[in-house]
Amino acid sequence: MQLTAGLKQFIRAHLTDNTDKLLLAASRFPGIDIRFAIDQIIARRQIQHKLPFWYEQDELIYPSRLSTEQCSSEQTALYKQQLLRGNTVCDLTGGLGIDTFYFAQKAGNVIYVERFPEYCTAAQHNFKVLNTSNIHIIHSDACDIIQPLQADT
């Protein structure tokens, strides 16, 4: 899961192309991981209006189509950011990391929890690209994180 200069150029050049036809013509693109490229193209299409700031960042990696379908929009993440209280926040369903990223702009310490390793890898890469250093990534199921916690009575 690496965005080389050639892969980024391929994605930009084929952003509006029919991805089924691209897949069928994979042999015409030696050196390109065509499945990964197509996933990135489809993800970028999905976020163009939903996440305009992220769409403008060519270096970001989208771990799956599902992650871009299920993530918060920038507007929603900014709204959630306004609701924050305190200096530490834990996002127990990290996913693509949209909420986590916007939480990190307000809170001093943010914990991103995600059970899928490829999402954690992408989040680590993306947070670095976005110059966000106050996020701690934990690869775990949210239930395992909250189970030892006890509620105040």
List the model feature ranges, each with a label.
Residues M1-T153:
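SAM-dependent transferase fold signal centered on methyltransferase-like domains
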